[in-house]
């Protein structure tokens, strides 16, 4: 009775002498007749704003359904404006005569700002969960105007100021069509296709040594499509599918960098797999083949890759299990690095694309032991990855002492990760602590260098559930790795957060990197034999960052039974080298 909405009641009958249809021993019946709602709606918003800097993200959305159809519309706005990010860099260049030339670059003043808009209109038709058809049209607009960095340059005995300016503007409409059909209780078909257009205009200026300015007018068109058939047979489940992607890029570089890049990239991938269970053993066995056809300004290649995959999970007892996964796949280079353009980075360095880059073969192994009971969740995980003929950093020193960075296919990159995790409920469903840690080992085998590096990582958290309140704390020591000739560190992170739920509202307040007014965001070392660089980046706005999140949701009427989308395709790469 308490769950009834009085607005839905059409008539109430009081039956004083009910018949046998209501059962024996029934003295009277109250018959409440309601009308079924054929439509409904949902509206909501999700807003996040930094209270210590100009940064925010906000979304509003609405859904309306009637019968088997639902329309939804959402709009997202995000942006930032910061002045607190600065870096300092020391560089040592070994010249052709064997002497060393030193340059220091220190940021004196910076301004970074950007704004992004995205709107999305979606129509969904669902016949319970047997058939789902969904189509959506979205548009994104991004603008980052008039950003600049003023640097103090110490070039040998010479000291001066240099200014770097850049601007970036893009818009991107996309059409997404999704279909799911439960053909029979055991068979299903899923398909998804996404078409995207990206238009980008960028401008860059830097006057270290001498003025250097260029603009880029970029146009990108892509089609991503995938279809999967699944049949749940008695001994196992069989699935097969095909994935196709096409991307056309036309980027025109004007000014001091002059080039017209036209790229066509086609990739076709087909696979089949079975998964099932034999007593305590769950298994997945499959294989696929991919074919890549690539052309750019007279450069072309065809590339085939075999994709075997195996996954085994053995339940040792009620709480302990062991799993192993193996797979091989292709790894395509970032599209921007396959262009034939050459861009000046500073007075001594250039970045050059390589149209002859080919994909690599990646082989992955993962072994895991896990244990779970009512209060403890723990696992030990080992991961090893081998990249054969990967795209690796290559530096060339010219006769006039210019240093050119590019990528070429070289010998091998390997990565080893070993980690352990444990989460424990100190008070069941009330207070939980968790921690993980391990090591990460990188191996880089180039044609003319070998670099290896070992790093350690850890993270810990504590969460308290106090009715409608939730309190959280998290800390880690950052991320360290070495790829090619670049050793990098992403800053340590810590945050405390409190959240509260009240009716249709959710509130949360977070404090990131507390008591740190000059947060170290990153550090990078370049280890080339002829070029050593050490760069450290600091961010004032990321230290002592206080953010407030408010979300609200209201639903009325009938709810639309739409199945979860099983395939999600998306393209955002404009292929512009920077």
Where are these regions (language model features)?
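Membrane-proximal, glycine/serine-rich, low-complexity loop/turn segments characteristic
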Residues: 1-149, 164-196, 230-240, 306, ...
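Surface-exposed extracellular loop regions of Gram-negative outer-membrane beta-barrel proteins
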Residues: 27, 32-46, 147-151, 193-197, ...
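C-terminal beta-barrel architecture of Gram-negative outer-membrane proteins
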Residues: 61, 437-444, 455-501, 505-506, ...
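Outer-membrane beta-barrel translocator domains and adjoining extracellular loop/strand segments
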Residues: 84-100, 145-160, 175, 201-210, ...
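Flexible loop/turn segments at secondary-structure boundaries
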Residues: 198-200, 246-249, 291-294, 331-334, ...
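Outer membrane beta-barrel strand-and-loop segments of large Gram-negative receptors
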Residues: 222-224, 269, 354, 358, ...
């Amino acid at each position: 009775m308490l769950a009834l909405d009085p607005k839905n009641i059409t008539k109430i009958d009081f039956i004083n002498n009910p018949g046998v249809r209501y059962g024996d021993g029934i003295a009277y019946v109250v018959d409440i007749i309601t009308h079924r709602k054929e439509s409904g709606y949902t509206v909501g918003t999700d807003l996040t704003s930094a209270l210590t800097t100009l940064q925010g993200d906000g979304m509003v959305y609405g859904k309306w359904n009637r019968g088997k159809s639902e329309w939804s519309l959402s709009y997202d706005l995000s942006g930032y404006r910061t002045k607190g990010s600065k870096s300092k860099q020391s560089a040592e260049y070994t010249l052709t005569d064997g002497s060393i030339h030193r340059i220091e670059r220190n940021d004196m003043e910076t301004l970074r700002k950007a704004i992004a808009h995205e709107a999305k209109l979606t129509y969904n038709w669902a016949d319970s969960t047997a058939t789902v058809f969904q189509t959506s049209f979205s548009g994104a607009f991004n603008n980052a105007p008039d950003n600049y960095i003023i640097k103090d340059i110490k070039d040998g005995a010479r000291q001066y100021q240099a200014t770097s300016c850049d601007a970036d503007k893009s818009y991107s409409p996309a059409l997404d069509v999704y279909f799911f059909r439960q053909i029979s209780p055991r068979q299903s078909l899923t398909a998804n296709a996404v078409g995207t257009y990206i238009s980008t205009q960028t401008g860059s200026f830097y006057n270290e040594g001498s003025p250097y300015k260029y603009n880029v007018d970029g146009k990108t068109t892509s089609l991503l499509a995938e279809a999967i058939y699944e049949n749940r047979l008695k001994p196992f489940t069989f699935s097969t599918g095909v994935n196709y992607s096409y991307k056309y890029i036309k980027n025109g570089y004007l000014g001091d960098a002059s080039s017209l890049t036209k790229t066509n990239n086609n990739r076709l991938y087909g696979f089949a797999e079975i998964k099932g269970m034999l007593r305590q053993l769950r298994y997945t066995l499959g294989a696929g083949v991919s074919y890549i056809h690539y052309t750019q300004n007279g450069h072309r290649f065809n590339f085939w890759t075999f994709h075997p995959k195996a996954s085994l999970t053995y339940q040792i007892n009620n709480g302990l299990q062991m799993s192993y996964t193996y797979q091989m796949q292709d790894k395509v280079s970032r599209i921007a690095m396959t262009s034939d353009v050459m861009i000046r980075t500073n007075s001594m360095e250039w970045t050059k694309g390589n149209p002859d880059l080919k994909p690599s073969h990646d082989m992955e192994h993962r072994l895991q032991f896990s244990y779970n009971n009512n209060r403890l969740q723990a696992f030990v995980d080992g991961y090893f990855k081998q990249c054969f003929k990967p795209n690796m950093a290559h530096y060339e020193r010219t006769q006039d002492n210019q240093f050119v960075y590019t990528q070429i296919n070289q010998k091998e990159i390997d990565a080893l990760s070993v980690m352990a995790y444990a989460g424990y409920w100190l008070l069941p469903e009330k207070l939980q602590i968790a921690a993980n840690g391990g090591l990460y080992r990188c191996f880089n085998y180039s044609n003319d260098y070998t670099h290896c590096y070992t790093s350690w990582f850890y993270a810990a958290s504590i969460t308290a559930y106090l009715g409608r309140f939730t309190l959280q704390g998290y800390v880690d020591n950052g991320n360290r790795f070495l790829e090619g000739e670049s050793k990098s560190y992403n800053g340590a992170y810590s945050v405390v957060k409190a959240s509260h739920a009240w009716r249709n509202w959710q509130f949360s307040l977070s404090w990131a990197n507390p008591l740190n007014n000059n947060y170290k965001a990153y550090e990078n070392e370049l280890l080339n034999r002829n070029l050593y660089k050490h760069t450290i980046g600091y961010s004032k706005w990321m230290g002592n960052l206080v953010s407030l999140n408010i979300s609200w949701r209201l639903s009325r009427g009938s709810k639309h039974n739409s199945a979860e989308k099983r395939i999600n395709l998306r393209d955002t790469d404009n292929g512009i080298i920077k």
